[in-house]
Amino acid sequence: KSETYKSYKIVFDKSKRQINVDTIRHIFTFDLLKNINPPSSVCVIGDGKCHFVIGNLLTFPNSRIFSINLSETLINDYLILKEMKILDDTEIQVIENEHDAILENKKLILIPSHIKEFLLNKRIDLFVNIASFQEMTIDEIENYFRIIKSNNPLFYCCNREYKKLVGGEELYFDNYPWGN
């Protein structure tokens, strides 16, 4: 069992939360990411149930976290963090429009996906996407890649090699817009 696993286990045990396959995927991710220089800012696209936010707080405690997701998922994430007593309300900022300023004392910035353009050119050091691109259309994925590239960050992406969406659109990992 890795140190990352042990850290997650302590936090999850305190809140009577079980480690599941999604948590394990994030533990493996942080076991890889902890080998990079600690980023000052990280953006997670499509975190679910705060798996990434929690791991980031444990692995890179000095980094600011940008979490972008559907509004209803962000509400759920906020409630999880509140219940687990991981961050105080004073450390969390919710972005309401593209022109909001990032407040200096905020640790976690929550961005509803309908205003994703807020993330353009924010000098974010690391972007992470684990299993949420496979739920988006290729047009939406291309929009995220444009935002990611505008920040010139490291990018960690873990999604299926192939997925057919409900509407019939087929996604191929190798066909994501990786090039510059």
Question: Model-flagged regions — what are they?
Answer:
Residues 128:
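A conserved beta-strand element that flanks and buttresses the S-adenosyl-L-methionine
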Residues 135-148:
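A short, conserved alpha-helix within the catalytic core of class I
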Residues 151-163:
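Conserved beta-strand signature within the Rossmann-like core of class I S-adenosyl-L-methionine
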Residues 49-61:
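Conserved SAM-binding loop of SAM-dependent methyltransferases across substrates and taxa
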